[in-house]
Amino acid sequence: PHQLAVNDYFIQDPRYLQTYANYFCKFIDAYKEQGIPVSMVMFQNESWSYTNYPGCAWTPEGIIRFNVEYLAPTLKKRHPEVKVYLGTINTNRYDIIDQVLSDPRMPETIQGVGFQWEGGQILPRLRAKYPQYKYVQTESECGWGSFDWKAAEHTFGLMNHYLGNGCEEYTFWNAILYDGGF
């Protein structure tokens, strides 16, 4: 939620961090009421996007703090069946993600890591260093949605890269969007 960010960074106030963890539980509850099970969550989509519209980036320290001290404990209490994955990783900054994953509390906090876009560039190195995690790809690059032969070849190359480097899932959810939006 944009009200939890200032200057496009998540506010690192314990009240806001706990509120955000509670939001996850509310969404999981709402989905459950609709008969939709949630088996895994990631703390934020594209947490390294610096855009010209309001965003919510995170520092490595903030990512560790939120996942270790707030999200994982809250879910363990209220939704122990839901796994926590680190993601989505949309940066090729190995140093940042390595800093997060090297925290000694992370193996007890997350079960996997989700990648998309530039994050795929560091997948092989991270998987080699951290083989204990499950790895997934979370959003296919769809470009301008042309879905022509050239786009198919590009997507096939992406699938080959992610699956060939140990991802257990390849997600192309954006392929089902309506042309021109809703």
Model feature map: region roles:
Residues 33-35, 106-107, 164:
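Alpha-helix termination/capping residues and helix-transition junctions
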Residues 43-48, 87-92, 115-120, 140-143, ...:
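Active-site beta-loop-alpha junctions enriched in small/polar residues
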Residues 1-98:
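Substrate-binding cleft and catalytic face of glycoside hydrolase catalytic domains
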Residues 73, 77, 81-84, 105-149, ...:
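Glycoside hydrolase catalytic-domain groove-lining segments
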Residues 39-43, 83-86, 111-115, 134-139, ...:
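Structural recognition of the beta-strand scaffold that forms the well-ordered cores
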Residues 137-182:
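Aromatic/acidic polysaccharide-binding cleft in carbohydrate-active enzymes
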